[in-house]
Structure formats: structure tokens, C-alpha cells
Amino acid sequence: MRAWIFFLLCLAGRALAAPQQEALPDETEVVEETVAEVTEVSVGANPVQVEVGEFDDGAEETEEEVVAENPCQNHHCKHGKVCELDENNTPMCVCQDPTSCPAPIGEFEKVCSNDNKTFDSSCHFFATKCTLEGTKKGHKLHLDYIGPCKYIPPCLDSELTEFPLRMRDWLKNVLVTLYERDEDNNLLTEKQKLRVKKIHENEKRLEAGDHPVELLARDFEKNYNMYIFPVHWQFGQLDQHPIDGYLSHTELAPLRAPLIPMEHCTTRFFETCDLDNDKYIALDEWAGCFGIKQKDIDKDLVI
């Protein structure tokens, strides 16, 4: 649903706006890197749960049991590949020619890779990455963020401490907005609605707005309980492939890629969350990054 990615960017731009942005260091790729057709992001019943499959270029090709007139019709290929028939009329996935990608409509379709190269679209990026399969360069190449490459300044220590303040407030506001729009849209589950209802009806809730970090810090201290569920909820939205209590680089992509051009501390923040440097962020690490106390971290809140 294209409306969701627009909704995400608008909210992020208003609630997470930071002075400058940060350049991303090269990262060792643990899993096949993320990939997204930004304008074609799929969503499930809950629009905040961006389907990570749209960002994952490492999924295996699968073939449906139903036999169609065109064998390629039900043969799925991962991003960067297209289906072709071999001499036996058997479907197979081959690298897509980048020149066959649709012409980009505008700047918003461009993406930046981690080697600081701008591609006309995610289609062009993945098609190029496919041609490098099996090489060291191809293994390390990944989609860094949405939009053309730009200078992203370093994230200062003082700025890093401000990031979770804005992020927490943003997560709370996203949930409240979804709750207000959820009459017949199934944007939230019934269990989620019960949790968010308490936040929505709390008269002490800080309304959405461009607040100074001092106010955000005071609000978190005074209304701490209001932020516990939003932090757990976002973890659950990202922990999808597989649902194992850990966030991989791929699973972080739906949240991370749109934010990097606007929030220059995004990458450094998520790196600091990985306390044991195993390239995965566990629930304890995630919640701790947002200031949630150990006694309040509860896997049963990931609903």
C-alpha cells in the first residue's frame, strides 16, 4: 500500500526530524541484504507491519503447484531476477537486465547503495546486484537507504542521546494515529487496541508535535508506562522473517531505510543496540536502547 510508506515518511519527517544526517560505515553482511520497491511496499492487516519479504533479496525462488499455460506465471523469482523458460520449457530464474527495469517516475524512486552509488530505482539496484552473485563485491553490496545518495554527516554523541527520545515519541504517536483510524480498517489487532486505548485516553499524553528534546525527556520520565508497549509493538512488527525474538539487518530495513536520509543517527543507534556484536538485536537489547527497564521487558507484549 503506497499510502503507508507516505504515512511513514511524513510521520518520520515531522517527529524524527534531526539537524543533519550521518554517513553509514560499511557493514559486514550477515544475511542477504534488504531490498525494497519503495513505491510497492506490501502490507498485511496491520499497515505498520511492512512485509519484510518486499525488502528481502535473499528469499528462495518458489514454484506454485498449480500449472499454468505459461509456466513462468506461477514461478516466483527474488528481487533482481526474472523468470525464463529453458529448452525443456521449464521455468528458471535468471538475472534481470537493468535496462529492462521500468523508467523511474521521479527522484523518490532512487535508492542509495552502501558503496555510495545512486541507482534509478530498487529494480536497477537488485538487477545489478544479481549480476554480482557469487562475488565478494556482490555479497557486501546492499541497499543502504531510500532516495539518491547524499552527504550524511557523522552522528555526534550528544545527538545520539536525542534519537531515542524522538523515536519513542514517534512510535507512540503512530500507534495512537492507527487507533484513531482503526474503526473498520483492521489496522490493529484487538489485543493491540486494548493496549493503545489506555494511551489514547490518558489525559497526560503528550500530543504529537515538534517538541524540544528536553520536553520529550521529561515526558518519558513522568509518563514512562505509556512508552513500554509502543517499543515492544515496533519490535513485533519487524521481527517477522523468522519470528525468533531477534532482529536481523534485513528485518530492520523497513524502518531503517526510509529514516536514514532524515535521521542521521539511525545507523549508529541500531549499531549501539547490538550490545554483544552478533549482528542481531534481541528484544532485551532493543527495549534497553529505548530506555525500557529490564523488569518491564516482556515478550508477551510483542503482540
Curated annotation (Swiss-Prot):
GO biological process: negative regulation of angiogenesis; negative regulation of endothelial cell proliferation; positive regulation of endothelial cell migration; regulation of cell morphogenesis; regulation of synapse organization; semicircular canal morphogenesis
Subcellular localization: Secreted, Extracellular space, Extracellular matrix, Basement membrane
Keywords: Basement membrane, Calcium, Copper, Disease variant, Disulfide bond, Extracellular matrix, Glycoprotein, Metal-binding, Osteogenesis imperfecta, Secreted, Signal
GO CC, any one term: platelet alpha granule
Result when mutating E263K: In OI17; no effect on expression and secretion of the protein; altered secretion of procollagen type I
Reported effect, N173 to A/Q: Strongly reduced collagen binding
Glycosylation-annotated residues: N116
Superkingdom of source: Eukaryota
Signal peptide, first to last residue: 1-17
Annotated EF-hand domain residues: 261-296
Database matches in SUPFAM superfamilies: EF-hand, EGF/Laminin, Kazal-type serine protease inhibitors
Transmembrane segments: none
Positions that bind Ca(2+): D274, D276, D278, Y280, E285
SMART domains according to UniProt: FOLN, KAZAL
Chief location bin: secreted
Keyword Secreted belongs to the record: yes
Occurrences of domain Follistatin-like (ranges): 71-93
Disulphide connectivity of cysteines: C72-C83, C77-C93, C95-C130, C101-C123, C112-C149, C155-C265, C273-C289
Listed result of changing E263A: Loss of collagen binding
Disease: Osteogenesis imperfecta 17: An autosomal recessive form of osteogenesis imperfecta, a disorder of bone formation characterized by low bone mass, bone fragility and susceptibility to fractures after minimal trauma. Disease severity ranges from very mild forms without fractures to intrauterine fractures and perinatal lethality. Extraskeletal manifestations, which affect a variable number of patients, are dentinogenesis imperfecta, hearing loss, and blue sclerae.
Homology family: Belongs to the SPARC family.
Free-text function comment from the UniProt entry: Appears to regulate cell growth through interactions with the extracellular matrix and cytokines. Binds calcium and copper, several types of collagen, albumin, thrombospondin, PDGF and cell membranes. There are two calcium binding sites; an acidic domain that binds 5 to 8 Ca(2+) with a low affinity and an EF-hand loop that binds a Ca(2+) ion with a high affinity.
Name of the protein in its database record: SPARC
Organism of origin: Homo sapiens
